[in-house]
Amino acid sequence: MRLRDDGSVPDDNPFVGRAGYRPEIYSLGHRNQLGLTLHPDTGALWLHENGPLGGDEINLIRAGGNYGWPVVSYSREYSGPRVAFRTWQEGMEPAEIVWLPSIAPSGMVFYDGDRFPNWRGSLFVGALRTGMIRNTGHL
């Protein structure tokens, strides 16, 4: 969903005027998105999602992108079977990072400080399941 500060829909939202879609939609095919951050240099929007049983994802969000849930997934249902029978499909955006088993991502931030220059541009992701902060490296 993408809105202006006053709640109105930007004219350049990717689904404005498309039959069968609400104009507020910016991207679709998400399951349980809990964390968003902007890349400090590019301004790109990054999102993390929790899968039901593994298949947690980091996604680079593109206008109008379809991220596949539940058609494509690395996840399993809590009862055991796979959510989907494929992990990729043409026309759907692949995840940048997938965790198996689940780490239960709980927030993320790009490091853009000066104290640790080797970490500049690295994405750090909090993990509820392991109690760790994971460095994904430079993205």
Labelled PLM ranges:
Residues 1-139:
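Beta-propeller domain segments
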